[in-house]
Amino acid sequence: MENEAAVFKVLADPTRLRLMVLLSIQGETCVCKLAEALNAPDFKISRHLGIMRSAGLVEARREGTWMHYKLSDARSKLEKCLQQCFGECLATHTTVKADLKRLSKANCK
């Protein structure tokens, strides 16, 4: 139960929950685009993604100066269920719709 509790602890933060939803819908995405989507500075998004990475929820890939993140493969039935729910259940949430709209217009500089 410790691993499951740790997942919920990480996702209890609204910013990290929004990041999980965006990554479940959009797939691999650059930090700068995620920052634009959430109207937050890059360093704040990077910090949240670092916490999520430490918990095994996301993976990172460097491309030059850019860091790209995607959801990790689910390690348990719980994680698989949550990933599906993020993409299906929360995609129509008002906040997520606004995030997706900003994400579609985001442009790394």
What spans do the regions from the language model cover?
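Amphipathic alpha-helical dimerization/coiled-coil segments
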Residues: 2, 76-109
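N-terminal helix-turn-helix DNA-binding core of bacterial DNA-binding proteins
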Residues: 2-43, 66-76
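A general structural signal for well-ordered secondary-structure junctions
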Residues: 14-17, 29, 58, 96, ...
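Alpha-helical residues within the helix-turn-helix
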Residues: 36, 53-54
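Short, hydrophobic-biased segments on the C-terminal half of alpha helices
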Residues: 49-50
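Beta-hairpin "wing" of winged helix-turn-helix
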Residues: 54-63, 70-71
